[in-house]
Amino acid sequence: MIQTQTRLNVADNSGAREVMCIKVLGGSHRRYADIGDVIKVSIKDAVPRGKVKKGDVYNALVVRTRKGVRREDGSLIRFDSNAAVLLNNQLQPIGTRIFGPVTRELRGANFMKIISLAPEVL
């Protein structure tokens, strides 16, 4: 469950380390984002000479949450931290590598590029 002011780790090589959710996209009064949802984020911590810098505002795709995701068979997939992948205005990933596992739920949300870059799909 990601909401406004939530800080997330960045799971790509765009140069950002940590981002903060400033808006959950997809409705005027939508409060929470889950795995596979697009949010608006502000860069809070970045590496020097990266593609992004602190204070920039980007779209991001939530790829891991501590709340997890419930599958049809009743299983629950949960992660140790909240993580997102930075996207440009065309909702394409900014980085060229994805770190850590992502879930199969991204497949139905038209994010096949991120699934193909990920080292592991759960």
UniProtKB/Swiss-Prot annotation:
Keyword field: Ribonucleoprotein, Ribosomal protein, RNA-binding, rRNA-binding
Matching Pfam families: Ribosomal_L14
InterPro entries: Ribosomal_uL14, Ribosomal_uL14_bac-type, Ribosomal_uL14_CS, Ribosomal_uL14_sf
One GO cellular component term: cytosolic large ribosomal subunit
GO biological process, alphabetically ordered: translation
GO molecular function, one term: structural constituent of ribosome
PROSITE patterns, sorted: RIBOSOMAL_L14 (PS00049)
Assigned protein family: Belongs to the universal ribosomal protein uL14 family.
Subunit-level organization: Part of the 50S ribosomal subunit. Forms a cluster with proteins L3 and L19. In the 70S ribosome, L14 and L19 interact and together make contacts with the 16S rRNA in bridges B5 and B8.
Function according to Swiss-Prot or TrEMBL: Binds to 23S rRNA. Forms part of two intersubunit bridges in the 70S ribosome.
Name by which UniProt lists this protein: Large ribosomal subunit protein uL14
